[in-house]
């Protein structure tokens, strides 16, 4: 007995982990948000530039000294000339390569002010809220070492939040300086390569000051902390093993204060013997004076010595935009929404291509994360966008007539489409238009054609009327929101329907 032929295997449709598909409503909300950010950046004199999604891996700084393969965190492949190429993991490293190629030429005016928007890619383990592809929107000034450039970035970040509808009191731009943190580590005797691991532990503890009370952070600075609330309960995090006096110094300098002058005074007092620490304090003081002179109070921009950001990357001031909103974590517990963007000064990044110092400072907004926050605030229109006006096909042999109607609507700037499914059932055509969220449909049978007329069915008004009609018979007799007009009046009458319901397309 012959074997039955095997059915061809169907390919399973599945999305790789850490990625997401996006629907029209989400795309429209992103576009609306990006345009508002763009308007603020351009108001400050920043101009757009685009760099490719791929760069040579060494340009991204993703080779370790003892490896001939890119280290973790990037998606990479070898070109046919055996050069390693990687997908960009941020928008700053490609900018450094772009500037390095053009530095000193007529094609680059210094200080160079640019913005970029696009997707970046991280080869990391995905999880809740952690994606392998996400959008960033950056602005950077290259070629200016003055704290005025850093102050401007902070002011622009504040203006961007307000342009997006985030009110004062719902956000704050927090500013610190890498040099201040280096001074803190110097003051407690953790200079030198032999203390690298302890320095990192101290910085991680400081970074917890916005999440834990000072007493809990003190445990992380000391022997360690049990996350169950008492010894022996929960997981244990090993601490930095600082003495009580050393922990006092760290907490005194990094304590968040509402008055920037108090924050500066505390840092100055404890970092008097640290040259690098004093330089950082001086830069913070200059930034504070500049933003205050421009009318930005501590409710918008504040000095916060507890801010810790990507310390291997930054060389001076660092900034973080925090949303002061309460949301819930995956266990339903109330938590602060937290950071939606940040940046800082990175004077060493461009210099890799130049062999000389090139000052630079910039700011990056996590578009996807900020969009989630704005949706939570109700600042983005997440309703489905109106679909096009649908011209139905009543008579199969008159498709050319219907296509002419579609063309006249499009010429007038009205979104329109011809129904391209099986025209046998008019009910299915109307269901299609309804599912497409169309504001109205156009119907013309042979009788209407003979009279030089057509029918316009207002689907929005029809839905409202349907809710008030008790029986199918009443529905058939009344045919709510459907009216006739002359063929020549098609565009004008459709415009009346659109205006009645404030229909517009972004």
Curated annotation (Swiss-Prot):
InterPro entries in the record: aa-tRNA-synth_II, aa-tRNA-synth_II/BPL/LPL, Anticodon-bd, Anticodon-bd_dom_sf, His-tRNA-ligase, HisRS-like_core, HisRS/HisZ
EC number: 6.1.1.21
Gene Ontology biological process terms, A to Z: histidyl-tRNA aminoacylation
Keyword line: Aminoacyl-tRNA synthetase, ATP-binding, Cytoplasm, Ligase, Nucleotide-binding, Protein biosynthesis
CDD domains per UniProt: HisRS-like_core (cd00773)
Chief subcellular location: cytoplasm
Compartment annotation: Cytoplasm
Top-level taxonomic group: Bacteria
Gene Ontology CC: one annotated term: cytoplasm
Catalytic activity: tRNA(His) + L-histidine + ATP = L-histidyl-tRNA(His) + AMP + diphosphate + H(+)
The UniProt record lists the keyword Glycoprotein: no
GO MF terms held by the record: ATP binding; histidine-tRNA ligase activity
Oligomer status and interactors: Homodimer.
Family recorded in the similarity comment: Belongs to the class-II aminoacyl-tRNA synthetase family.
HAMAP family xrefs: His_tRNA_synth
Protein name: Histidine--tRNA ligase
Organism: Bradyrhizobium diazoefficiens (strain JCM 10833 / BCRC 13528 / IAM 13628 / NBRC 14792 / USDA 110)
């Amino acid at each position: 007995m012959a074997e039955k032929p095997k059915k061809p295997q169907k390919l399973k449709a599945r999305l790789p982990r850490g990625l997401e598909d996006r629907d029209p409503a989400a795309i429209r909300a992103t576009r609306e948000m990006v345009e508002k950010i763009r308007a603020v950046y351009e108001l400050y004199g920043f101009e757009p530039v685009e760099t490719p999604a791929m760069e040579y891996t060494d340009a991204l700084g993703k080779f370790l000294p003892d490896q001939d393969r890119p280290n973790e965190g990037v998606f990479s492949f070898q070109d046919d000339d055996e050069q390693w190429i990687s997908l960009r993991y941020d928008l700053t490293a490609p900018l450094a390569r772009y500037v390095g190629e053009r530095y000193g030429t007529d094609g680059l005016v210094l200080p160079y002010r640019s913005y970029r928007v696009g997707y970046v890619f991280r080869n990391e383990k995905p999880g809740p809220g952690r994606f392998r592809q996400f959008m960033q929107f950056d602005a950077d000034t290259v070629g200016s070492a003055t704290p005025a450039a850093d102050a401007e970035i902070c002011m622009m970040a504040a203006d961007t939040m307000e342009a997006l509808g985030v009110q004062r009191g719902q956000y704050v731009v927090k500013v610190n300086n890498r040099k201040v943190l280096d001074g803190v580590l110097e003051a407690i005797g953790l200079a030198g390569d032999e203390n690298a691991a302890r320095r990192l532990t101290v910085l991680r503890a400081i970074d917890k000051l916005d999440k834990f009370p000072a007493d809990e952070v003190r445990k992380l600075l000391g022997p360690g902390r049990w996350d169950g609330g008492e010894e022996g309960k929960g997981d244990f995090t090993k601490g930095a093993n600082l003495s009580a006096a050393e922990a006092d110094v760290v907490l005194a300098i990094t304590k968040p204060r509402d008055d920037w002058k108090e924050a500066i005074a505390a840092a100055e007092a404890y970092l008097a013997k640290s040259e690098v620490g004093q330089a950082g304090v001086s830069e913070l003081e200059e930034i504070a004076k500049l933003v205050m002179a421009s009318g930005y109070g501590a409710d918008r921009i504040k000095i916060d010595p507890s801010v810790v950001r990507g310390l291997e990357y930054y060389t001076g001031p660092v900034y973080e935009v925090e949303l002061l909103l309460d949301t819930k974590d995956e266990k339903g517990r109330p938590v602060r929404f937290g950071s939606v963007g940040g940046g800082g000064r990175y004077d060493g990044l461009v210099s890799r291509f130049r062999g000389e110092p090139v000052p630079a400072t910039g700011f990056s907004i996590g578009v996807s994360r900020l969009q989630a926050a704005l949706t939570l605030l109700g600042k983005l229109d997440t309703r489905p966008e109106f679909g096009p006006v649908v011209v139905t096909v009543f008579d199969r042999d008159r498709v050319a007539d219907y296509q002419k109607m579609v063309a006249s609507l499009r010429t007038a700037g009205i979104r329109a489409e011809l129904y391209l499914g099986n025209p046998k059932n008019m009910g299915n055509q109307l269901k299609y238009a309804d599912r497409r969220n169309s504001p109205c449909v156009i119907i013309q049978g042979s009788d209407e054609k003979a009279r030089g007329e057509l029918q316009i069915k207002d689907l929005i008004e029809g839905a409202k009327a349907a809710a008030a009609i008790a029986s199918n018979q009443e529905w058939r007799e009344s045919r709510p929101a459907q009216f006739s007009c002359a063929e020549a009046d098609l565009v004008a009458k459709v415009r009346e329907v659109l205006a009645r319901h404030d229909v517009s397309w972004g």
